[in-house]
Amino acid sequence: MNFVSAQLPDNEERRAEAVERTGLIDSNQASLFNIYCELAKDITGYEAVLFQLFDSKERCYLAEIQPENNETQNLNTRRPKEGSVCAHVLLDTKPLIAFDVTKHEITKTHSNEKGVKSYIGFPIIDKNNYALGMVCMMTFSKIKELSQDKIDLVEKLIKKAAHQIDVMSDQKQLTSDRLINALDIFNQETNINDMIVFKNFIHVCNKMDVSKDFEKILIENNLCTIDSKSKLELTYKGKKIQDSMGLHTKIMNNI
């Protein structure tokens, strides 16, 4: 019997959009999820752990621990969804548990070129019930069964990872909304429809240096002035616009 690839989830288009909204694939934030791989490995004693998100085309490892390298790595490894056991994990809210991969209905027909002995996969489900990806654990040297307590513990761990993704996605959306609102206010108050000028104005708000060319533009528009120490600072008009935009320093640092 040949291995049967997983069908796409019924909500695949919306699910993939939810993954894209996280902005985590190919980002510099993947290392934030190393701890989940390390804890899962410590709890289970399994030799490999993969923290994966599935976009519309393939699966991407945000973090991974491989047997040949005992440290967590962030290589943004990409693999096909088609033909993978991991894709089956997206189809259920419960973990796929195959302590002996030669006996489980899904895994027993897989080609298993890497010689996996035991496999467990936990879906990463966001607050909107989209399966963004999964965390899987594997052994290669021997079959290793786990107690229900350990399964439950890992499941709670993965739920915490999903919650972290939710929080990060919400913050990302909130920052985007605030920036759009700030840009609208800046355009209305200054009649300057130039994103680069806006960015340099934010730099001044954040006590950062700008080029002489943009100093001149900001001064000409009565947004900035030169203080007694020859430093560029906001005028009264500039400060009013900054207050109207309501951007905090942490958000301005992201621009």
Pin down the residues of each PLM region.
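Signal-transmission linkers at sensory-effector interfaces
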Residues: 1-31
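Regulatory sensory and allosteric helical modules in signal-transduction proteins
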Residues: 50, 54-60, 70-109, 117, ...
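A short, aliphatic-rich beta-strand micro-motif
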Residues: 117-126
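Helix-loop-beta substructure at the N-terminus of cytosolic sensory domains
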Residues: 26-61, 207-234
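Short hydrophobic/aromatic beta-strand element in the GNAT-like acyltransferase core
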Residues: 48, 121, 134
